[in-house]
A protein has these predicted regions:
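Alpha-helical transmembrane segments
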Residues: 133-134, 147-166
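Central hydrophobic cores of alpha-helical transmembrane segments
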Residues: 115-118, 170-179, 221-227
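N-terminal TM1-TM2 helical hairpin plus the immediately adjacent luminal interfacial "cap"
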Residues: 31-144, 183-191
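Membrane-embedded alpha-helical segments of multi-pass transporters/permeases
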Residues: 124-128, 165, 201, 205
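C-terminal transmembrane module of polytopic alpha-helical membrane proteins
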Residues: 1-27, 183-249
């Protein structure tokens, strides 16, 4: 037992190293609170869709809406089909399994970054295969779902586990099965899965390089680099459309 002044404790804390994860990120809480928060948001949005169709209409992404409402590229990743409970059920189960694992491994900041970047990459990759001309009815086909981000996390697990000498055979099997199902089950945006996978692998690769060289700057440079590439692809898609690039914003 003893008494310490507040200033003494503060000065002592300055000299202590903050705990970090195995990948050099800032360690978070013992429980995957960020993963739980993302799941809660998705569930609340889905419940809102049950109450009013307007919720789906306000957050879903359609190619023709991208130039005027670009935030839909990201908000659509927090919504799911209101008529298919298995859609949100599978995505949230997968997110809980891999999300909690990665959150503890990467730290909450890097984990949030990879989730958002891969979610955006999934939407943009799907966009690349769609018509964007407002005069084309297909340009108003909506997309929702967190699967782009989930597949991005799948890829990150494989890359990071390989770097750390851990087994990922089970994850490879899951990706293979879902890749086949994407071509068998109708209305599955396999393009979003592909975009998320590639983006997740690239970001995870940057994290492994950052760990090897003990340079957090490399990790964030990699994350921002993938984000920049995704944005360029989206802008390029609209710029090369028959109607030209519409103002983003």
């Amino acid at each position: 037992m003893g008494v310490q002044c507040v200033d003494c404790v503060r000065e002592q804390a300055k000299g202590e190293r903050r705990p970090v994860t195995v990948l050099g990120g800032r360690a978070g809480a013992d429980k995957p609170y960020l993963t739980m928060a993302i799941i809660a948001i998705c569930v609340l949005v889905w419940l809102g869709e049950q109450v009013s169709p307007r919720v789906f209409q306000e957050v879903a992404f359609a190619p023709a809406l991208g130039p005027s409402e670009p935030w839909r590229l990201l908000t659509s990743a927090f919504a799911h089909s209101p008529n298919q409970i298995m859609h949100i059920g599978f995505n949230m189960f997968a997110l809980w399994i891999v999300g909690g694992y990665l959150e503890q491994m990467m730290g909450w900041a890097r984990y949030l970054a990879i989730y958002l970047v891969t979610a955006l990459a999934g939407s943009v990759t799907w966009l690349l295969f769609q018509p964007v001309d407002p005069s084309d009815p297909g340009a108003y086909t909506p997309i929702v779902g967190a699967s782009g981000a989930v597949f991005g996390l799948f890829a990150a697990v494989i890359v990071l586990n390989r770097h750390l000498g851990r087994d990922s055979s089970g994850m490879l099997a899951i990706i293979g099965i879902n890749a086949v199902l994407g071509f068998i089950i109708p209305n599955v945006a396999w393009q979003a899965h592909l975009g998320g996978l590639v983006a997740g692998a690239l970001v995870a690769l940057a994290l492994t390089v950052a760990r090897s060289r003990r340079s957090p700057v490399i990790a964030w440079a990699g994350i921002l680099g993938v984000l920049a590439l995704v944005v360029v692809l989206a802008v390029g898609k609209y710029a090369l459309s028959p109607t030209g690039l519409l103002p983003l914003g």
